[in-house]
Amino acid sequence: MELEKKGIELTLQRAHPFYKGIMLEEKLADLEKMKQKKLFSRISLSNAKASQEIDLESAIKEEANSDALYVEFESLEESKQLDVVLHLLRDRFLYCLYCGCHYDSQEDLIENCPGINEEDHE
């Protein structure tokens, strides 16, 4: 991720709900890859190690689900999630996804961007 290149660690607690879903999927995918690697290398897991992996997976899911904002964001329809992300980009970062550009100020964004939705840019 871009933040990691700058030396900033992005944790589930600090991430926007949109990124929490992505980060959660990555953690679970990494855990699954680790399980598959052990399975294919024919290294048998002891009951203790298997239990630790199950506990880790449960902890990852529990951590994500304990955040009310994340749970609320994930419960939205995809179109509503997109609206949240588009507004966040505009309000916090002065960026329009459809223009593909960063603006110098809120006034610059209002003057030069036709709107928040894709239809506004046609």
Swiss-Prot record:
Signal peptide: none annotated. Pfam families: DUF4187. Disulfide bonds: none annotated. InterPro entries: DUF4187, GPATCH11. One of its GO terms (cellular component) is nucleus. GO terms for molecular function: RNA binding. This is Uncharacterized protein C6F6.19.
